[in-house]
Amino acid sequence: MSRVKKATKADNGKATPTIQLPIDVNFILALDLSLNATGYCRHRLDSGETDYGVIESNGKRGIERLDAIVGRVRGLLGEDPGAGKPVCKLSTLVVIENYAFAKANQAHQIGELHGVVRYELWKQGLPYLLIAPMQNKKWITGQGNSDKNLVLKELMKRYGFDVNDDNIADAIGLMTLTKAVLGKWEHPLVAFQKEVVSKVLEATAS
């Protein structure tokens, strides 16, 4: 069963991670949260089925925009409106690309978006994993400071996903990285991939 633990203080004085990786993951939802175009990727480990796309804000602003994005995330988790519970609740892991503020005047708005999405996951009892943007880029390209064009190119070359939207590309990168972290990646890892996986595992170690 998926496990979530509270943050505590480790012997070295640093806070330990707020989650432990679930032991029975079968469904990954990866999110590259954005105010205008949130990239997502869903993957079932048992069947290999994958889909991806973009959650667009469609001109909405403020609370209305936050509510619309959270609603779409809820839908992507397979929630049955009648039962009010996600179909895959006990086997789901959500992975989110952590904060990266491109525009200073949007920092608080992006923070609000991350907050309401994480609150929704908390309400549903779903664990989530945070991946730094530079870790995700390094996983995809081998370089943590890669531009969007290189990310798109290397995603096709290394992982076989031909997309033309960088938000979707980031979400697919998160999904494939999470598979590797869970030990479910089907191919041998090269040195830089091993390094990224090791860093993520260190951050989630109990």
Spell out what each predicted region is.
Residues 1-206:
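Phosphate- and other anionic-substrate recognition elements at nucleic-acid/protein interfaces
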